[in-house]
């Protein structure tokens, strides 16, 4: 590790191979907690690169639990977290509607770190087994078109990194890596990101990982979701090209919703919010979720524009298709 630390201290970027070797050792529990913390902090101070992100993702995937069935058409819509917005579980709610629209959703997630309720916490309240076996996850992806991929189950070696991350208490490269380390080889992706200036770096990493199409979204105030106030910035990966764009709620003909109107609560409260959205109960939560679903359909290519995606989202919620996806997942992922 000494040579690696020297290189980072000289603000020299690491290659994919170098990072992959380091993380392979970390995931085998061959590196001390203090060294892991120093490594993560060093990369943060130096500035993370797409090669470094890709190297860590590949190391994690090589140690991940493998599903018995291969799926090559899946999508994930989880974000980095770390935005301190304390909003409700938007991407978790959205995944049921995206699945109802015909997208196979391999929704990655974890327990709460900075918010009151992580996706795993909410889904447990709803009776979904977040620690389901690989066999059950494959069945859910096949029969429901949706499964919740719990980070702790699919990446058991991540436990060696957790203490160092908790000790640091700040976002690191691991926040960027988490949404990209889905054990499935995703075809498309919608990724929320807490810093606009990292979008191009992450887009390059996503391209290196073989995604056909992706959208990386940062909302106003560096939210890792799109919001109905201020300006949203997204980077689009399409046909090998990377481009950055902005939009506002006014561009989509939607009403303004302040951040204070979509604050979440504990797992039980957020589960009730999720159900209210899928029941099509009018609220700021519904409008914000519909926006992010529309972005998901656009990221996948199911919709030609975000506005078209929003319209599709409204239809799938109104006709009960999205709520039915939840019911089916409750029956299968047990």
Curated annotation (Swiss-Prot):
Domain of life: Bacteria
Needed co-factor(s): Mg(2+)
Top-tier EC class: transferase
E.C. numbers: 2.4.2.18
Binding annotation for 5-phospho-alpha-D-ribose 1-diphosphate: 79, 82-83, 87, 89-92, 107-115, 119
GO terms, molecular function: anthranilate phosphoribosyltransferase activity; magnesium ion binding
Record NCBIfam families: trpD
Entries under HAMAP family matching the protein: TrpD (MF_00211)
Quaternary data: Homodimer.
Protein's UniProt name: Anthranilate phosphoribosyltransferase
């Amino acid at each position: 590790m000494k040579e690696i630390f020297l290189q980072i201290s000289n603000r020299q970027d690491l290659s994919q191979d170098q990072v992959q070797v380091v993380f392979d050792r970390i995931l085998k529990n061959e590196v001390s907690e203090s060294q892991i913390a120093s490594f993560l902090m060093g990369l943060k101070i130096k500035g993370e690169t797409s090669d470094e992100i890709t190297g860590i993702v590949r190391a994690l995937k090589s140690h991940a639990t493998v599903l018995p069935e291969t799926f090559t058409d899946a999508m994930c819509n989880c974000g980095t977290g770390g935005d301190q917005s304390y909003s409700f579980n938007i991407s978790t709610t959205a995944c049921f509607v995206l699945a109802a629209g015909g997208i196979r959703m391999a929704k990655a997630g974890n327990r709460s770190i900075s918010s009151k309720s992580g996706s795993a916490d909410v889904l447990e309240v709803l009776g979904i087994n977040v620690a389901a076996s690989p066999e059950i996850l494959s069945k859910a992806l096949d029969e429901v078109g949706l499964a919740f991929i719990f980070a702790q189950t699919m990446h058991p070696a991540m436990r060696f990194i957790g203490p160092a991350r908790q000790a640091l208490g700040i976002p690191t490269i691991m926040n960027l890596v988490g949404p990209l380390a889905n054990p499935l080889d995703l075809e498309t992706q919608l990724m929320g990101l807490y810093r606009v200036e990292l979008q191009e770096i992450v887009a390059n990493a996503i391209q290196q990982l073989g995604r056909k199409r992706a959208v990386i979204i940062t909302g106003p105030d560096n939210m890792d979701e799109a919001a109905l106030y201020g300006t949203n910035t997204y980077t689009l990966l399409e046909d090998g090209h990377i481009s950055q764009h902005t939009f506002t709620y006014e561009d989509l003909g939607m009403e303004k919703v302040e951040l204070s109107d979509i604050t979440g609560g504990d797992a039980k409260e957020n589960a009730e919010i999720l159900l209210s959205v899928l029941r099509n109960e009018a609220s700021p939560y519904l409008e914000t979720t519909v926006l992010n679903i529309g972005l998901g359909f656009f990221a996948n290519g199911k919709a030609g524009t975000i506005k078209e995606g929003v319209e599709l989202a409204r239809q799938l919620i109104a006709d009960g298709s999205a709520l039915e996806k939840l019911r089916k997942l409750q029956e299968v992922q047990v």
